[in-house]
Amino acid sequence: LGAFTFTSCDDFLDMQPTNSGNAEGAVGTVADAQVVINGVMSAMTSSSYYGRNLFMYGDAKGGDLTIFAAGRGLDAFYTFNHTSNSNTYSGFWSRGYYCILQVNTLLSNIEKLEESGSMEDFSEAKGQALTLRALFYFDLVRLYGLPYNYNKTSYGVPNVTEPLTVNAQPTRATVEENYRQILQDLSDGAALLAKKKTKQSGYADYYTNIALQARVKLYMEDYDGALNAAREIIESGVYKLYEPADWTASWSKQFGSESIFELGITTEESDLGTSSLGFYLMRYGQLKNAMGWYLASDYFLNRLGEDETDVRWGIMDNDEYWVDNEIERKGACYKYMGSTTLAGDGKATNTAVNIKIIRLSEIYLIAAEAALHSTKQEAGADAAAGYLNEIRRRSPGLAPATAATITDDMILDERSKELFGEGQRFFDMMRMGRTIEFNDDFQDIPVSHRGKTIDRTFEKIVLPISQDEINANPALENQQNPGY
């Protein structure tokens, strides 16, 4: 396949650094360091992180998904039925910090090797590790902290950059301090990475780092910085947008021309099977044990339906409502089954579909939004429309954006259409201060833990720290998020 194979989580725990004292000598060479990084990336494919829940969380809470019936599983994302003792989804916290602490131990071990006179060049390994740590902190602060541009002095998550001792009890940093650490890691990481696309697909390389910088700076409303980073990737020519006619088929391919950072899923190790993202988004009952627990909301379908010739209909198909009512409703998403015919992406099982974390399409959309607000000479509404129209070509029935017509809402709508199922919508709506409306009336499902609409003043837009985590680290007891 031209890509590395992730080691399993079990193997990783058996042979790689942990936070116990006996991990000190586990890394001696660059090859050892790369095996550790492989293990960290394998851990990312867990159902509690990128393997499923993070993407489900972003779209369910953002109003682009709805549910057909209550009580099937993961519907607490949609209903906001979270407390510190139930439906905490603490796997986000534990998996995120597991990955962070493995990276910290790796960086500490490398530092000791370098200080002892090792002649190995660990630059790439350190650059990858720092880039990944920045991603992990970015995810955690979005889940547990308020938007940067809303209240950056509120609690974020603990900034831990060294291996922890047994008795350590780190406290929460502010959102601003988290973002400062994220930017520092990205800056330090970029300086260590070769300015090229990695030969082995799937690793966090230089362009992964720059893409993350673009995403993070957009969240911070550093529009000049976001535009600089996005333009560097676009103008490098390393990646190429799919032609509209090729967009649907791209989901049945691995490491395509748009893929900047993509997690490889293997049939032997990280295939979640009936617990996979694909099974949760496809039509209920289409295959044995197919979940179909989430469907596209009417609001998303109306948005995509602005152009019935939009190529992105190609990964949508009839959902459970169609089964029950014989009325066409293309609310089932097949991005993570490869195609509506369940083609997969070239592996032995059709649920072992790679997770595309950052695509070039997103970078164009970042460039459009940043250019619309940037003060840079090469920015402005004309430039913003140009970037947006490269993605809007996938909706041939819609008029191109112009300097006179382009708005934040137009870009936000395009982000919804393009990034559906990729976990971005909720965070976009929160950072932009928008009101989210939920499609509760679709099946008249009663929801008591939120209203039909929410905005970022609603306390439960952030998750609780689970009581188990507080019991393990009493220093967090007085730092619980409001409302829990």
Give the ranges of each region predicted by the language model.
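Short, surface-exposed recognition loops and adjoining beta-strand edges that mediate ligand/DNA contacts
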Residues: 24, 51-68, 145-153, 157, ...
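Membrane-proximal, proline-rich intrinsically disordered regions
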Residues: 9-56, 286-288, 304-308, 315, ...
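TPR-repeat structural position
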Residues: 179, 223, 377-381
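Conserved, well-structured interaction surfaces
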Residues: 73-144, 173, 191-196, 348-355, ...
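Extended ligand-binding clefts on enzyme/binding-domain cores
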Residues: 31, 220-221, 227-348, 353, ...
